[in-house]
Amino acid sequence: MKTIKLTLLALAVSSASGYALANGLAINEQSVSGMGTSFAGRSSSAQDASTIYGNPAGMSRLGREVSLGGAYIHAKIDIKDASGRYATGTQVPGSNDGDMVPNSVVPFGYFVTPVDDRLHFGLGVYVPYALISNYEHAFQGRYQGQASKVEVITIQPTVSYKITDKVSVGFGPTINRIEGKLNSNLTAGAFGGGDAQVKVDGDDTAYGFNVGVLADLTDDLTFGLTYHSKVSYKLKGHTEVTGAGSANPTFNALLGRLNGKYDGSLNLTLPESTDASFTYRLNNDWTLYAGATWTRWSRLQSITVENEGTPTLPAPIGNRLGEVTEEFNWKDTWSYALGAAYQLNPQWVLRAGMAIDPSPVDNADRNVRVPVGDRKTFSLGAGWSPTKEMTIDVAYAYLWEDNVKVNRAPDALRGGYNAKYDNSAHGLGAQLTYRF
């Protein structure tokens, strides 16, 4: 039954930590210089080699350089007013500790080099989607999901071309590898049995592209536009069920047929997004940034998992493992960011920014693996250049969300779960850029 959670194996891809500075399942932590301004102006400010992700056209404004870094994420999640019921109406026993997202780091790396006066080449490695969560063993909502670890790692070779001194374009194909493992429980309490354990794994490699344009509208105003394509996966993996049974010999013979390892597959498309931003150089000291990002989360309406060799049991269980459709009903979102940078002296630049990022999911469709709500982020950052060849960027960000509800109904093999989630997170990033 829990093969429905294979859907999230492809979907649940927010930081390698489960919480990040973007909403839904996306990650923003591909740049620490951008993190300091809440990623405002990401498409219009080619500050370093991380522009390979932000806007590949920005490489035309760089020399030969490498940028390496990462962001550390510490999430705080409180669960309130929780309750769980079996389909029979009896209460699901268990705890609701919260803080199920472990601390972790999101790494990235980029390299840019000129080929000639107009052509640049670059290579980037980063994480665009990820999820890690690990509820306690006795979590009351364990039938809806208990442990998740999913990552997408992207490699992006990139070229840019300077059309004029004011306009450049860039393009990069993306090679995207998705891998994940998910654990959850299913119940046979109505048949005199206890909890069974379900482990799901799957992977795939798929391809997409990023394309961008960067233009100086005036001597002080720069506009950038970046498109990140959708990526279509066909995940293949396995679902293993263990521990299904009953003290009743008749039911035990039936439920025992659920135990086994099944081949499964699903088609999944992770959405495209478009970022438009402006960078305005107010004077020699101040630079202002503004940006908006549209993400087509409405691609995630429903997903069907197909499994081979699954048993058909009498009602009410039936063949719950054969073909399972999970409804998501996500909606498109617009996120917005404003930021500023102050050049304190030739060596130091100070940054600040704020962003608002709506959730793509409503209370009716939210689940325990991705319990996200409308999000706001405030960030501070600094860049230190002790030499012309080296810059060290650091950034801190705090995000908080509107309180959200999870409402999941029970069925024959899953206990239902209802709770309120209060989510926040701290992010700390560091990045080294070296020019040579």
Residue ranges: model-predicted function:
Residues M1-A22:
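Gram-negative bacterial Sec-dependent N-terminal signal peptides
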Residues L21-G34, S38, Y86-P93, N103-F436:
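Outer-membrane beta-barrel porins/channels
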Residues A26-G41, S60-D78:
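Transmembrane beta-strand segments of Gram-negative outer membrane beta-barrel proteins
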Residues F39-Q47, A75-P102:
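Surface-exposed strand-loop-strand hairpins of Gram-negative outer-membrane beta-barrel proteins
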Residues A40-A46, I52-R64, F111-R118:
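Outer-membrane beta-barrel pore proteins
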Residues L68-K76, D99-T113:
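Long, well-ordered hydrophobic secondary-structure segments characteristic of membrane-embedded
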